Amino acid sequence: MHYAYPAVFREEPDGVTVTFPDVPEAVTCGATLAEARTRAADALISALSVHVEDNRPIPKPSAARGRELVSVTALEATKLALHDAILAAGITEQVLVRRLGLDEKAVRRLRDPLQLSPIGSLESALRCLGKRVEVSVVDGA
């Protein structure tokens, strides 16, 4: 899945407010459009990490329809994909612990989008769930 979400940037007298229709709890602002864009990515991954923490599915992004897309980082996307794969497989974190031969703390770190993890460890975890990681690079705006 591609974790790029349409954002609404609304200019207001005191700055720019950013909201995400697909992730309503992700809201931020900045004094300038540039600052709002920087904060938007942080607000998005913070809100999505709560979905992981609460064991809820990650919302699917809707079509951009002329709105600017805000993406999570490649590492964050891989962690969100792992979370989605765990939910789709209907397994618990403890089952993944046994399959990977890791301790619970290590698996929790692998799942946490706000923690750094080696990409190889994430690829191994996804392979255990019948998934593989592909990376694509696209032109920037």
Tell where the protein language model's regions lie, with residue ranges:
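Short, charged, surface-exposed hinge/linker loops at domain edges
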Residues: 1-4, 39-109, 113-115, 122
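Residues at or immediately flanking beta-strands
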Residues: 17, 57, 132-134
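DNA-contacting interfaces and partner/effector-binding or oligomerization modules
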Residues: 1-48
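Hydrophobic/basic alpha-helical segments enriched in Actinobacteria
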Residues: 23-24, 53-57, 128
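DNA major-groove recognition helix of helix-turn-helix/homeodomain DNA-binding modules
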Residues: 120-136
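Broad gene-expression machinery/nucleic-acid interaction feature
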Residues: 4, 15, 69, 130-132
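Short, charged recognition helix plus adjacent turn
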Residues: 137-141
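Ser/Thr-centric signal marking residues that sit
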Residues: 28, 32, 92, 121
